[in-house]
Every structure is written in structure tokens, then in C-alpha cells.
């Protein structure tokens, strides 16, 4: 790179001094500088920054016009300025002396040739780039995850707080507000539910007789320390039934009692007669077949069954050894 810079800058100088007599000397100086620059360029690969540190910008020293003959002076050292002025015939030294070569001008200005600054080689390491990209990605993801985690924790805390408050409010409301029946339930289910809700307390498993009710009252009068729950377990009824019996003002009447006793006796006799009739019918229907005591419908059906059986080939009611059975000719 440094050799290319020297060559480009010196080519411009050679273009200016192509009609001068010292063209050969410039060519020699170019060869010297090119050899020195090639040797120095082999030691260090990056030389753009080194050439900038030497305060000599060979690429940007001159700016040429369209025809390439005239150049503008931009930034040059004093030695190079004098050289260019002597070559172009503008300065005090109008070829009065032998013009200095570029190598001599550089030696005068710097004492020695500008040494290249050693800079670290910029080599593209794919592994390091991938590592840096990975670290940057992990840092970015960690940052995003941290922010998301913080936001998630804040959101969860907020939601938990709101849910806690909502649960507390729900508990308080459910404790006070009664539960309404579901609209989708049919009317007969609602009716049963309402009846159970109304009459759940008054739901005795059996009805007590008047004698039992009198006994219950006597027990409570003689033993007041008995509780309603204990009396309900003793008579096998609900506690509410015991409470209503004790609170009622019913008093048994002798006339009513005689009437009730007579009615019960009649019901008992009727029930016994029905049981005896059922027994007689069962005994009468249990007789042999084709008996006159059997119903008429059964007498008409029995001969038909016998005719069907006798119509079969080799019909016999039973079978015996060494005889045909069922027309199959098998002998047993």
C-alpha cells in the first residue's frame, strides 16, 4: 500500500517534469523509493495510518485539471513547495540550481526517510466475531428476559393482588347474597327443590298414631330433661315433628277414639279376606292339565298342542330301548 502511494505521487511529479532534463534522475529516485517502500511494506501490512502520521499526504497533495498539466497546491512541506516552485518557474529558484530530488527533499525535511508506524494487523477473526455477537445477543436476551421477568413478576403480583381482593369481595358477597336457582333447570325440578326447601324440616319418615303421640307427651311431662332430638330418635321421626306434637293443643276424645277403633277393625277384616281369596285362587290354578276346574281358555288350547305333537313322524311321549324315536331310525 505504501509503495502504491509513493508511485502515484511520484508519477504526478514525473508528469510535471517530463519535459525537463532531470527526468532520468527522477526515474532513479522513483526506483529507489519503490524498492525501499516494497521492503518496508513487507514488514507491515497496514500502512494507511502510517502514511497519515508522516504529515505527507501524497495522494491528496495535488489536484489536476482536465488536461492534467496544471496542479493546485494543497498541503505540502516547505521543501516540496520549493521544489515544485522551481520546477514550475514560479519561485525564486527558477532552475538556477539543480533541483532537488524527492528523496533529498524528504531527507531535508525529516532528516531521514519517514518510517512507517507499526500498527496491529486488522485480521477478521470469525470466531471472535461470532463470540462477540453471541455475547451481545445473550446480553440483549438477558436484558430483555430481565425486563420481561420484572414485568411478569409485577404483572403476577398485580394480578395476585387483584385476585386476592376479588376473592375477598366474592366471599363477602356470597355470604350475604342468597344463591339463585339456575335458569336452565326445568320447572318440575324447581318445584321439587322449592318443596324440599320449604318442607325439609317437616318431613317425618312415618306418621305417628294417636297412642304414640300420647306416649310422647307423657314422656316429655314425666321426663322434661329429654331433648327433642332424643325423642325423635326414640320414635323414629324428625325433630320438627316432635316439636309440633308437643306444641299442639289436640286432646283425644272418647267418641272419636271409639270411631277410629271401629274403622281400624273393619279395615283389618277386609284385608284378611282379600288374603284368603288370593290363596284359594292360587291353589285352584295349580291343578293338573285338562281339568274342568281350569279356565275355559286353557281347555281350548290344550288339544291343539296335542294334535301338533301327534302330527310329527314317530311321535311318542317317551322313548324305549331298541325302538325308533322321532322317525330317525336310531336304536338305543
Curated annotation (Swiss-Prot):
Source species, domain of life: Eukaryota
GO CC annotations, alphabetized: mitochondrion; nucleus
Keyword annotations: Mitochondrion, Transit peptide
InterPro entries xrefs: NGRN/Rrg9 (IPR010487)
Function comment: Required for respiratory activity and maintenance and expression of the mitochondrial genome.
Stated family: Belongs to the RRG9 family.
Protein name: Required for respiratory growth protein 9, mitochondrial
Chain's gene name: RRG9
